[in-house]
């Protein structure tokens, strides 16, 4: 995907991208490639792949979830090089955005990126979700929590739901369909205060499969969750489901 295809494809999906926003995306791409020469931030190095697999892919929640186009608070868990949080912020600058990552080298990149793009109302946090979800400045404070991760769904539920206020949503961005994981999530959802809302299956323009799953926060998460760092990954609530 090249920049023209990026704009045309999104415009055809009723998500117009202004010239000013395209300048920000181009700056982002160039800075990511330059920074990656000294710090490995992404396995995706080709510009055409970054436009598709990072930028376009990050914006897919805006195509399927109308509430994501409004003013809202959003936390991106395990943001890495800024995906999906920074592309979402570029397009919807009404977001109050928090980017959380456990590696300082990624936070250093994100701090410089935010400054370079002159993005407002963006906070970076160096740490683990298991720790910061117990911090009252972050716990149940967000309208949305999002993750583009390969972790088991039950693990992600435990990491994300504690950040979201009752009435908010978490958004899981998956590369394959996860019926068995959702089917096996009932115990985790009950413990954590969530309820499956919607699931969208679609393909990127290159035919790669994607799934968006939204979970409504219907009650406060029990105080003991999330458990200590590493435990949600090793021993998900309700077990692992293939």
Swiss-Prot record:
Q: Where is this region: Disordered?
A: 221-242
The record, for CDD domains, names: AdoMet_MTases
Q: Binding residues for S-adenosyl-L-methionine, per the UniProt record?
A: 78, 83, 129-130, 148
Spell out the GO cellular component terms annotated for this protein, sorted alphabetically and separated by semicolons.
cytosol
- Which enzyme type, at the first EC level? transferase
**Keyword annotations:** Cytoplasm, Methyltransferase, rRNA processing, S-adenosyl-L-methionine, Transferase
Location in the cell: Cytoplasm
Q: Which GO terms describe its molecular function?
A: rRNA (guanine-N7-)-methyltransferase activity
E.C. no? 2.1.1.-
Give one Pfam family, short name only: GidB
Record InterPro entries: rRNA_ssu_MeTfrase_G (IPR003682), SAM-dependent_MTases_sf (IPR029063)
Function recorded in the entry: Specifically methylates the N7 position of a guanine in 16S rRNA.
Which family does the entry's similarity section mention?
Belongs to the methyltransferase superfamily. RNA methyltransferase RsmG family.
Name of this protein: Ribosomal RNA small subunit methyltransferase G
Q: Which organism is it from?
A: Oenococcus oeni (strain ATCC BAA-331 / PSU-1)
């Amino acid at each position: 995907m090249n920049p023209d295809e990026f704009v045309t494809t999104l415009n055809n999906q009723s998500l117009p991208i202004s010239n000013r926003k395209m300048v920000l995306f181009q700056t982002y791409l160039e800075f990511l490639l330059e920074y990656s020469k000294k710090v490995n931030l992404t396995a995706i190095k080709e510009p055409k792949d970054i436009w598709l697999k990072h930028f376009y892919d990050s914006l897919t929640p805006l195509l399927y979830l109308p509430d994501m186009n409004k003013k809202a608070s959003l936390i991106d868990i395990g943001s890495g090089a800024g995906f999906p949080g920074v592309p979402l912020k570029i397009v919807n600058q009404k977001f109050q955005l928090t980017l959380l990552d456990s590696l300082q080298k990624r936070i250093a990149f994100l701090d410089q990126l935010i400054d370079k793009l002159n993005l407002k109302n963006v906070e970076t946090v160096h740490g683990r979700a298991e720790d910061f979800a117990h911090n009252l400045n972050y716990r149940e404070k967000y309208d949305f929590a999002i993750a583009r991760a390969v972790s088991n769904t039950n693990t992600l539920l435990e990491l994300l739901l504690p950040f979201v206020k009752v009435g908010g949503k978490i958004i899981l961005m998956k590369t394959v369909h996860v019926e068995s994981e959702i089917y096996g999530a009932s115990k985790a959802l009950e413990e954590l205060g969530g309820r499956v809302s919607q699931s969208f299956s679609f393909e990127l323009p290159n035919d790669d499969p994607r799934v968006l799953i939204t979970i409504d926060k219907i009650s406060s998460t029990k105080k003991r969750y999330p458990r200590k760092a590493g435990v949600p990954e090793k021993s998900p609530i309700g077990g692992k489901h293939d």
